[in-house]
């Protein structure tokens, strides 16, 4: 080997050359990415050209309009100005079409377009690919497999379990309540609905409302809600690598771990129980099957059982959707009744006439409270638990007014905007339960608290039963009053929440 080959003075030059090549490659990749984003932006501009929208910045999109946190108010102004639909630009090369017209909703919900993976994929580390995130034939197989878990015969015994969970919460409130102070109800209602899911879907013994470990799961779900919403709107956090290295990414990872620890514990306890109980027919003779039993005994069309990954995804999905959405619904229903005492009073009279002292409620009672049901539905109209859902068009679509979209466009079905659309609901901000009176006519897709079409909420009957039980048992024990100093600040997350909580004053009735 020559001396010159070992000469260290030549190394800096070689290193410099490598750095130059790396720099050029990096610049080339950057230019290619910029060109890709530019071409995608031009495609979006052409795709959405039939749909007017407010002016937007070439890079920041409409983000400036939503900086003050009044997203829902801004959106409702758009609803009044732009008929049926309006594009929203998140940033330079990302946009989706907001729709809020029942005819538009009917068209999209009648199709089999997949969920908009651009945003929904951020949920996968938390809830996996269960019924919420699956698409196509796999989704269809899982939906058909899970449907028996929501049959009326299975739902009937749940009413007593729901009532037990509600009474535990109300007993707690009775100890906390005073005439001069208010109570933040969302946290307690979240624990109650988690308790209900654990008892009904997973046959949990005892009450998670009395278990401090359950608080960490509720906190993790709240954190994941906020982190998902924040990530969707952060251009730098679209990259999984960058997000994992960020403080928010690390917090999300820890919250996912806490959520998974909870669901894994539930699954392992049931597997151990089934090993002792034996085969399906033996279990069925001993007790009723619940949601988790259906999953563990289920067979896919090819005869195989669910994988552990699929099993946890369905449990995580139902654990979240089955408690957080109903907690949102119940909390906002209570707020709506607190701010409309005349309707609250009429509901209470109806319930007292049906239940007497309210000591017990049964399946048969649920269809015998028409006015209370009307008020529940009106509260769900004003405060839909799920503000919107997204679809990515798998084929071109033409709407009834002749406007069209090509394949690939993301469409956001804004349930909140639909429910507040003055062309659909006259005086939409006024609490009026009478449009929901039995026999009243309305567009089939004007009211969508549980979405619609083949991908509607599989647990909607379970949820409605729980809402009725919670409202009925609460109104016979408490009068609900608003706290004028703490008006809720609505925030659209995965579910509709309040940034400052939902504070109510409670007055004991008995």
Curated annotation (Swiss-Prot):
Cytochromes P450 are a group of heme-thiolate monooxygenases. In liver microsomes, this enzyme is involved in an NADPH-dependent electron transport pathway. It oxidizes a variety of structurally unrelated compounds, including steroids, fatty acids, and xenobiotics. This is Cytochrome P450 4A6. One of its GO terms (molecular function) is iron ion binding. Liver; kidney. Heme binds at residues 321, 457. Keywords: Endoplasmic reticulum, Heme, Iron, Membrane, Metal-binding, Microsome, Monooxygenase, NADP, Oxidoreductase. One of its GO terms (cellular component) is endoplasmic reticulum membrane. PANTHER family: CYTOCHROME P450 4A11-RELATED, CYTOCHROME P450 FAMILY 4. It comes from Oryctolagus cuniculus (Rabbit). It is found in: Endoplasmic reticulum membrane; Microsome membrane.
């Amino acid at each position: 080997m020559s001396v010159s080959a070992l000469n260290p003075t030549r190394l800096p030059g070689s290193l410099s050359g490598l750095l130059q090549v790396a720099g050029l490659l990096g610049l080339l990749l950057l230019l290619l990415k910029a060109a890709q984003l530019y071409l995608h932006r031009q495609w979006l501009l052409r795709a959405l050209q039939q749909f007017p929208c407010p002016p937007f910045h070439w890079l920041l999109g409409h983000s400036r309009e939503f900086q003050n946190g009044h997203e829902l108010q801004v959106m409702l102004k758009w609803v009044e100005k732009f008929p049926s639909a309006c594009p929203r630009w998140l940033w330079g090369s990302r946009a989706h079409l907001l729709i809020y017209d029942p005819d538009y909703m009917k068209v999209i919900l009648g199709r089999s377009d997949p969920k908009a993976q651009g945003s929904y994929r951020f949920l996968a580390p938390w809830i996996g690919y269960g019924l919420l995130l699956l698409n196509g034939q796999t989704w269809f197989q899982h939906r058909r497999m899970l449907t028996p878990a929501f049959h009326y015969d299975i739902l009937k015994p749940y009413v007593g379990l729901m009532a037990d969970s509600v009474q535990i919460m109300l007993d707690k409130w009775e100890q906390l309540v005073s005439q001069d102070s208010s109570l933040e109800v969302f946290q307690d209602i979240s624990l109650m609905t988690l308790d209900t899911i654990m008892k009904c879907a997973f046959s949990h013994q005892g009450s998670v409302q009395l278990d401090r470990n359950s608080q960490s799961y509720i906190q993790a779900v709240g954190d994941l809600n906020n982190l998902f919403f924040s990530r969707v709107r952060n251009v730098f956090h679209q990259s999984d690598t960058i997000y994992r290295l960020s403080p928010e990414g690390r917090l999300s990872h820890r919250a996912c771990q806490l959520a998974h620890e909870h669901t894994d514990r539930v699954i392992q306890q049931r597997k151990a129980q089934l090993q002792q109980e034996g085969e399906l027919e033996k279990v069925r003779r001993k007790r009723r099957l619940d949601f988790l039993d259906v999953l563990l005994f289920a067979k896919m069309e090819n005869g195989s059982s669910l994988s552990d990954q699929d099993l946890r995804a369905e449990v995580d999905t139902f654990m979240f959707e089955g408690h957080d959405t109903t907690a949102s619904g119940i909390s906002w229903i209570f707020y709506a009744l607190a701010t409309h005492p005349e309707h609250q009073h009429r509901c209470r009279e109806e319930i007292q006439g049906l239940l007497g002292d309210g000591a017990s409620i049964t399946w048969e009672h649920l269809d015998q409270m028409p006015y209370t049901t009307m008020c529940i539905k009106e509260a769900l109209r004003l405060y839909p638990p799920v503000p919107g859902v997204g679809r990515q068009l798998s084929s071109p679509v033409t709407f009834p007014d002749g406007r069209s979209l090509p394949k690939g466009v993301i469409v956001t079905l804004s349930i909140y905007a639909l429910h507040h659309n003055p062309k659909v609901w006259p005086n939409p901000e006024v609490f009026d339960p009478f449009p929901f009176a039995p026999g009243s006519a309305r567009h089939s897709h004007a009211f969508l608290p549980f979405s619609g079409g083949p991908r509607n909420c599989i647990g909607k009957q379970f949820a409605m039963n729980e809402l009725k039980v919670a409202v009925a048992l609460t109104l016979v024990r408490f009068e609900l009053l608003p706290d004028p100093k703490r008006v809720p600040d609505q925030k659209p997350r995965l579910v509709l929440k309040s940034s400052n909580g939902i504070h109510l004053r409670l007055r004991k009735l008995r």
